[in-house]
């Protein structure tokens, strides 16, 4: 069950990133403070749709998002920071940042999840994108369990 909605404050949760090769924590309050952020969730780094379509779409349109006043774009998944770092850095031209929801804090705080146990992945963050302005949720583009339409870079650009 989805626990967040437009005009809510984004939940203050802890993510992981690699800093000098070591996992470090970062809180959403640090990321979203006084910034316009697009947070894109994918079920898993290195998975086909995420790697071949979702992330490349945002890389391609990154400058267009900047022109619309977006400060940063973050991709998040229920992976560890080592996997997320390797995935994002496998795209040499990427200016996209990443967050690892290894402890599933975002999943639990938002309810935006998908059960991929049959595919060997377990319960993961679902595919979605959220536009956050200074910590306030302005729009949620939830794929509601599958597909890639609402949370695509092209759709977000049209709806900002």
Where do the PLM segments sit?
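Chalcogenol-based redox active-site neighborhoods
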Residues: 1-160
């Amino acid at each position: 069950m989805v626990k967040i909605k437009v005009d809510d404050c984004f939940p203050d949760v802890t993510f992981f990133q690699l800093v000098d090769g070591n996992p470090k924590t970062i809180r959403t309050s640090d990321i979203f403070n006084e910034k316009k952020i697009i947070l894109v969730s994918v079920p898993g780094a290195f998975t086909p749709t995420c790697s071949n379509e979702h992330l490349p779409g945002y890389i391609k349109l990154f400058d267009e998002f900047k022109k619309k006043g977006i400060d940063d774009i973050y991709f998040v998944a229920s992976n560890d920071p080592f996997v997320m770092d390797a995935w994002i850095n496998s795209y040499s031209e990427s200016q996209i940042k990443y967050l690892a929801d290894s402890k599933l804090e975002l999943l639990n705080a938002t309810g935006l999840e998908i059960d991929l146990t049959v595919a060997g992945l377990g319960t993961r963050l679902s595919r979605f994108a959220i536009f956050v302005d200074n910590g306030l949720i302005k729009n949620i583009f939830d794929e509601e369990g599958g597909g890639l339409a609402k949370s695509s870079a092209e759709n977000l650009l049209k709806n900002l």
